[in-house]
Regions:
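Glycine-rich flexible loops
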Residues: 1-411, 423-427
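Conserved hydrophobic beta-strands of the Rossmann-like cofactor-binding core
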Residues: 410-414, 464-466, 496
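Conserved glycine-rich cofactor-binding loop
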Residues: 417
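Hydrophobic/small residue at the entry helix of a nucleotide-binding pocket
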Residues: 420
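Conserved Rossmann-fold SDR core element
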Residues: 432-435, 460, 492-497, 518-556
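A glycine-rich helix->loop->beta "capping" turn
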Residues: 434, 450-476, 489-494
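Rossmann-fold cofactor-recognition segment
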Residues: 434-446
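Amphipathic alpha-helical dimer-interface segment in Rossmann-like NAD(P)H-dependent oxidoreductases
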Residues: 472-492, 503-521
Length: 558
């Protein structure tokens, strides 16, 4: 594990604990082997003035929704430590009450909600506290003899806490087990199946303890020859990828983006004989279930059957673990293990799919580490369910914001007019679509490769935007339609949009040609929109007129 500390840079913050906290937090966030996409949390304890100018012992802890790699001072929530210490002494505390009490303990109401680990940070008696979900630590703890391995490696240098639900339950357990402990005797604290804490009154020491302990864990794995992942080769037919993405979208009820990881490491894992068994035992850490569900789908040659089986098993999982009042989430997988192709992740947009993809990549790597140590043993499903369906996440279901109109849709823009191509791309992206654009004059020569590039990048094709045809051979459309049609057939609410600066009669002629072409191809269900560049004249397939007119306004309005 690389030590990224820079004395010269840190010197600029030596007299400002909050800025120093930002600096060291970003150091941790820059290392994906420590944290991923909002994971982990950090804090600093200092005296701050309240509204009346009174000095108050304050915990500045990472706020919900912030990423350690890019966090700013505004991303830390300031809370009164005396209130947090009182909360730690309670026998019980619901998640909603914990959030409410933490909000009331804030010195700044504009700050984000504090991390659910705020109480735990408060009771650790050091100025700086760092918490990560280090892969090497998880590889050791998620094994049959994880506790013995941690004790063998670290001895009495770390406190070891058995797994318990994150939030108040964890803070309470740590409080009870350590209230008589001499914290100065320890360099860190390992949470089984969860992660690791380090702490110090010195920011550099706390950070370097994290790097040191994780490096020792990596060296332990190296000595056990547990670091080398399987490698493999394979290939994916774009049509089968589009078909898989269509099946997932249909089951989820909304279009999704599919991101295929066909790296040698991803294919190597997918090709393991026991990948379907070890890969579906459980998540790397329980919080990953919020983004990626408890397990992935293992895809057989009949991917549709695999998805149906996954959905049935997910509903059974919910039924086994649910209690009154819970709302079942959709039963669609968030990622999959695909022999011969690699790992595939699904999301409502490219960023969401990439986050899940990163989780999948790190999970499969750690699974192999743990298997080399004697066997991958993640948390039992009831513990994972408790996190996936915990109170705070269920509350979000009831207050979710409306999605962008084209969220999850995938578009290819193949226009010879660069300005119009950029205009369309900007509007489609703003509406939530994943967009690939080619704006060279030679779009006809590039359309075939552009279609495949779009499918391999995002999983399919729903919208083709191309030039209006002005001659009897339907011009550029003669090249673009045959290349795109097999994928549009597998799209979600597929449509073809032709744009051009020409007369109403020319637009109408082009519209009729496209409709006829689709009908002759047996694909009359694909929507057609033909419009001039200022959207003053538009021809739309009658059965989709209302929806398509709104869409075309979004993507062509000048």
């Amino acid at each position: 594990m690389e030590n990224r500390w820079n004395d010269q840079l840190a010197k600029d913050f030596e007299n400002d604990p909050r800025r120093l906290r930002v600096y060291t937090s970003r150091l941790l966030g820059q290392e994906p082997q420590l944290v991923l996409h909002g994971g982990g949390n950090t804090s600093v304890k200092i005296n701050a003035n309240d509204f009346f100018g009174k000095s108050v012992e304050t915990l500045f802890v990472k706020g919900s929704g912030w990423d350690l790699a890019t966090i700013e001072e505004a991303g830390f929530a300031p809370l009164r430590i005396d209130v947090l210490n009182k909360l730690a002494q309670l026998e019980t505390l619901s998640d909603s009450d914990m959030v409410e009490q933490q909000r009331q303990a804030m010195l700044d109401s504009r700050a984000p909600n504090a991390s659910v680990e705020a109480i735990l940070h408060a009771i650790i008696p050091f100025h700086y506290v760092d918490h990560t979900h280090a892969n090497a630590i998880l590889a050791m703890t998620n094994t049959e003899n994880g506790l013995e391995r941690v004790q063998e490696l670290f001895g009495n240098r770390v406190i070891v806490i058995p797994y318990v639900m994150p939030g108040f339950a964890l803070a309470k357990l740590v409080y009870e087990q350590t209230k008589d402990a001499s914290w100065e005797d320890y360099e860190g604290m390992v949470l089984m199946n969860h992660g690791i804490f380090t702490f110090s009154d010195n920011a550099k020491e706390s950070y370097e303890r994290m790097i040191l302990l994780v490096t020792e864990a990596e060296d332990y794995l190296d000595r056990a020859k547990a670091l080398k992942p399987a490698l493999g080769q394979g290939a994916c037919d774009p049509l089968e990828l589009a078909r898989l993405r269509k099946n997932i979208s249909d089951l989820r009820g909304v279009p999704v983006v599919a991101k295929l990881d066909s790296s040698p490491e991803a294919i190597g894992f997918a090709n393991l004989e026991n990948a379907g068994e070890i890969g579906t035992r459980g998540p790397l850490t329980p919080d990953h279930s919020i983004f990626a569900k408890r397990v992935p789908v293992y895809l057989s040659e009949n991917t549709g059957d695999s998805i149906d089986t996954y959905a049935s098993e997910y509903n059974s999982y919910f039924g086994r673990n649910t209690s009154n009042g819970l709302t079942c989430l959709d039963s669609t997988p968030r990622w999959g293990i695909w022999p011969g192709r690699g790992l595939i992740s699904f999301g409502l947009n490219p960023k969401n799919a990439a986050v899940v993809g990163d989780i999948a990549s790190h999970t499969t790597r750690v699974i192999q580490n743990s298997e080399s140590l004697g066997g991958w043993v993640p948390l039992k499903e009831s513990d994972v369910f408790e996190v996936e369906y915990w109170e705070l996440e269920q509350a979000k279901l009831k207050t979710g914001k409306s999605a962008p109109s084209l969220q999850g849709s995938i578009a290819l823009i193949a226009l010879s007019d660069a300005f119009m191509a950029n205009q369309c791309k900007e509007r489609l992206t703003k509406a939530g679509a994943a967009v690939i654009a080619i704006d060279e004059s030679s779009v006809q020569d590039k359309i075939g490769s552009a279609v495949e590039m779009t499918v391999l990048a995002h999983g399919g094709l729903d919208i083709l935007i191309t030039d209006v045809a002005l001659d009897s051979s339907i011009g550029v459309l003669a090249g673009s339609l045959p290349a795109a049609l097999p994928y549009l057939k597998l799209g979600v609410n597929s449509r073809i949009v032709a744009v051009g600066a020409c007369s109403s009669s020319a637009l109408n002629q082009c519209h009729q040609k496209i409709v006829t072409f689709l009908a002759d191809s047996g694909e009359a269900q694909i929507g057609v929109v033909v419009t001039n560049s200022d959207n003053s004249v538009t021809f739309i397939s009658a059965d989709k007129s209302t929806r398509e007119s709104k869409i075309i306004e979004k993507i062509t309005a000048a």
